[in-house]
Curated annotation (Swiss-Prot):
This is Homoserine kinase. It comes from Citrobacter koseri (strain ATCC BAA-895 / CDC 4225-83 / SGSC4696). Keywords: Amino-acid biosynthesis, ATP-binding, Cytoplasm, Kinase, Nucleotide-binding, Threonine biosynthesis, Transferase. Its EC number is 2.7.1.39. Belongs to the GHMP kinase family. Homoserine kinase subfamily. The keyword Transferase applies. PANTHER family: HOMOSERINE KINASE (PTHR20861:SF1), HOMOSERINE/4-DIPHOSPHOCYTIDYL-2-C-METHYL-D-ERYTHRITOL KINASE (PTHR20861). It is an enzyme of class 2 (transferase). Pathway: Amino-acid biosynthesis; L-threonine biosynthesis; L-threonine from L-aspartate: step 4/5. The lineage of its organism: Bacteria, Pseudomonadati, Pseudomonadota, Gammaproteobacteria, Enterobacterales.
């Protein structure tokens, strides 16, 4: 049997719409992500477990893990009889790369089980394709960091899909999921078809400056440049209490904050553990809307998807 864990990820990071993403892991050592197991069987079966299993489609063929198995078999040109188990620990429509977790864990598990017939680049391409079935367009800003770990910049040139950007060890990512769902497709539909020239210029300046600050090891400058003129001005209206929360965490001492992925999760970046804890406490009391919500203090997950057993 092969068991694979795929971590949560925070896409866009305010400054890099559709081209930046970071894999994250709680500092307390708990797992924030999905687990997929693959075992030999006479015919294909899929079993769903975990805290959010009841949110998955009831029809097996609509389950993204089934679609991963089907696409993997197509790639190899043969049917592979296996028993798959999805441990769905990530809330759907959370802005934490929930579908990417399932896609990455399923495809890595299948590849490991079959003796690694596909290389990382081919696997990542298929991951983006399957993620696109859910979000409505192929993009890699969740699957790439989830699979490869760390902070990833999407390249998509010369056969390179993404490359790692150096992060900062002192950065702590406070992630607050309020317990409501926002579909990626809905969050994309709310965006304008065209942008003003000055917004495009600002976006390019922020992103280029952020990447430069990461490579030149200027954490304060990097955090200052984490600004979103592309998505947040439009998506904020989908998130109750978001604007107030951003103001509050800034007053507490967060270096930057924004929407994780397409929301509703809010991320706040801190460089001191006590600040991160105070931010987490405030968000836990004021941003969460029901019992399904949670707050985690995280750091970059540099390992990405990994075999557990």
């Amino acid at each position: 049997m092969v068991k694979v864990y795929a971590p949560a990820s925070s896409a866009n990071m305010s400054v890099g719409f559709d081209v930046l993403g970071a894999a994250v892991t709680p500092v307390d050592g708990s797992l924030l992500g999905d687990v997929v197991s693959v075992d030999a069987a006479e015919s294909f079966t899929l079993n769903n477990l975990g805290r959010f299993a009841d949110k998955l489609p009831s029809a097996p063929r609509e389950n993204i893990v089934y679609q991963c198995w089907e696409r993997f078999c197509q790639e190899l040109g043969k049917q592979i009889p296996v028993a798959m188990t999805l441990e769905k620990n990530m809330p759907i429509g959370s802005g934490l790369g929930s579908s990417a977790c399932s896609v990455v864990a399923a495809l890595v598990a299948m590849n490991e089980f079959c003796g690694k017939p596909l290389n990382d680049t081919r696997l990542l391409a298929i991951m983006g394709e399957l993620e696109g079935r859910i979000s409505g367009s192929i993009h890699y800003d969740n699957v790439a960091p989830c699979f490869l770990g760390g902070m990833q910049l999407m390249i998509e040139e010369n056969g390179i899909i993404s490359q790692q950007v150096p992060g900062f060890d002192e950065w702590l990512w406070v992630l607050a999921y309020p317990g409501i769902n926002v579909s990626t497709a809905e969050a994309r539909a709310i965006l304008p078809a065209q942008y003003r020239r000055q917004d495009c210029i600002a976006h390019g300046r922020h992103l280029a400056g952020f990447i430069h600050a990461c490579y030149s090891r200027q954490p304060q400058l990097a955090a200052k440049l984490m600004k979103d003129v592309i998505a947040e001005p439009y998506r904020a209206r989908l998130l109750p209490g978001f604007s107030q929360a951003r103001q509050a965490v800034a007053e507490i001492g967060a270096l930057a904050s924004g929407i994780s992925g397409s929301g509703p999760t809010l991320f706040a970046l801190c460089d001191k553990p006590d600040t991160a804890q105070r931010v987490a406490d405030w968000l836990g009391k004021n941003y969460l809307q029901n019992q399904e919500g949670f707050v985690h203090i995280c750091q970059l997950d540099t390992a990405g998807a990994r075999v557990l057993g």
